């Protein structure tokens, strides 16, 4: 989702064609979801063919641009989070409010994501320790203790 947003943005705003790999590199280098960061990454320089001439061109992409181009997708996620919270049983909801929500996966590394979600939802969001491996580690723990999680095995 985010990589295709970046590819589309680069076509529309910089008239440059980039692939999935380059979009991923941009996301890692300058990926952000808020326009004001305390620690600003340097702009990321992208090379690719101009869409009109096919001549090679270079474009410097800033984190503010990426925050702008990801805004609609992040807003959809915010809406989904709010919807899920509306459907959450009260007992679980109080645990969530008390402990917060932990973000995992590569998207959790987008600069400002936890802050933006916290401000939108009014519940503390945290980036999991080692977010790229957090789900796999949690699954491993659950599989070792399946008796504790029998309610999940339906």
Language-model-detected regions and their locations in the chain:
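Phosphate/ATP-binding catalytic cores across multiple sugar-kinase/actin-like superfamilies
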Residues: 69-97, 142-146
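Short, charged, low-complexity patches
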Residues: 3, 7, 74, 129-136
